[in-house]
């Protein structure tokens, strides 16, 4: 039999009447869990700032058509009336979430965090006078709440008088008031905890239980809330029409540019001077164009994690970062080691690193001790003032000075990945068989299986900014919001191994003996490219390397001139670009992926001679080398899905920056090192800042439109893949993504309709 609990509720003249309540625990727990699972499906996960990942703001509504989802959400948000009691409930919920979820910003850690949010709330809420207002009855009620959050939800639903048929709707409404905090908790429970147990466990069941308890105390008539007044959806429908017009205009323009290039796709050139494989990121497109104009260079596009699902521990780091798309689980742990250097340099580095740790620890202790902060200010105030002056008036000089001081104290050393399987520590490294398998798959996916140049560069990317909570949003999304240079260096190291090359030759990929692979990193803020070649043991043609470096520097200059037009600067292009990366007051160091519009899966010959204006994700692909469509299948179900997340985040952050973005950076406050709030207490903002999508308050820089995917491959192959994968059916048939196929034989353009039919585009 199911066990039962009895909840004794007292009566007072000033409180709501409370009655005795009996119910079966097991049955109710299952019912509540099922309801919560249903209502949380529409909550979009929110990634923390350190690994800020673009995600569709309406991810939970993708089962609807794009138009239906937008109308439903816009109408609901605009029809929500202001309610003072609701704001009080929100304020308390923000306080509890901020305290529990904090990861090092707070001076004093919330007690009982290791037992979970609900347990911690149970223990501490009776001491929160701002919540219970020292009312004895309320304090007694708080002290006698059930131990399980599901039981608390049932208790509160009954206390609020929510009818059974309305309970799921009521829970959905409850979650919708703070979607940012709810989304972050969803990320913790569904994404962060995929690899093990969470140190401070929390779930949306806990979140709902705590919120409903607070609601019972501060807003007991919440169930009687006036229904949201549905605003006429005419404005939203007009918005959708505007988006459609932009999409039609852009598609017509893009296909018009591609049409004359169709006859050039099969033209094969001679052996290139060097080949560079860039991330598919839209910021790579103009830089690739610039470097190709300077010599006989070939560039390719591939996901910036270079096909390696790894976690990487930095040489100086104490944390391990997942350097692969969030859709994948890291399979391998990789460490770094110092490249052979003189013993004195390594010793100096280690001592300097330890000295900086001690200095930081002492500073933190003095800063947060009850008696020493004033003395700290008195002793360091003048130096802090000088630092602030330099960073404000001469940011480039200030950064250079900081770098020089760091080099004096702790000289930097070059590192290389340790990827060989460790027999003593088997969870570290990659076996030889897996090295071969991942290297082959990467080369086939990027279309680099023959005609290798003497020098092949895998170029990851990252950004360089100051005082920017959203710094990871400018890094590589395919690397989980981290910089991609280490993945590039890792794949290059694997492909330089003789044993790997021999195995690849047996599988039909013959890499010439004089071909050398190197990793590199493209700084998308300044367009600097750093090539990592110190760990390469093979002979590198120094003339080619020197010429490539000179051409990369010229490409940087040319691309800066192109980019500066969009940044509205009157200064010298290169000087202003560098200043933006060093200036701690700069709200727009770069435009990121703003204006992204299309995802092109095709050989580079199709787009090489076209100015795509930095608006296209470019993934290299040769359908003639993919008879069964497995390579295209991977491209459409992985990188294209990530591109759609990016596209929709920019789209929704533009059309409603308050609801789906994060507002102006000027009023941001970092909360618990996990996200930002507007002011001192708001929902956790979960989209892009105003400055990332708007030229100014009234004019958008990003053009909101859905992703246009263009695939150079026969329709029958594409149709088979769409039928095979539900995610593709959802995105294409619900019109979250538009798909155009270019037939390689007839050179006709076809559009995939939501009815699963193809129509010719004329």
Swiss-Prot record:
Q: Name one GO molecular function term.
A: zinc ion binding
Q: Between which residues do disulfide bridges form?
A: none
The entry marks the following residues as binding Zn(2+), namely: 279, 281, 461, 476
Signal peptide region: none
Task: Extract one GO cellular component term from the record.
Answer: plasma membrane
Under the heading Pfam families, the entry gives: DabA
Q: Which cofactor does it need?
A: Zn(2+)
Q: Which UniProt keywords apply?
A: Cell inner membrane, Cell membrane, Membrane, Metal-binding, Transport, Zinc
Question: What topology does the record note for this protein and the membrane?
Answer: Peripheral membrane protein
Q: Tell me where it mainly resides.
A: membrane
Intracellular or extracellular location(s): Cell inner membrane
Q: Which family does it belong to?
A: Belongs to the inorganic carbon transporter (TC 9.A.2) DabA family.
Q: What does the function comment of this entry state?
A: Part of an energy-coupled inorganic carbon pump.
Q: Quaternary state and partners of this protein?
A: Forms a complex with DabB.
Q: Mind telling me what this protein is named?
A: Probable inorganic carbon transporter subunit DabA
Organism, per UniProt? Legionella pneumophila subsp. pneumophila (strain Philadelphia 1 / ATCC 33152 / DSM 7513)
Gene from which the chain derives: dabA
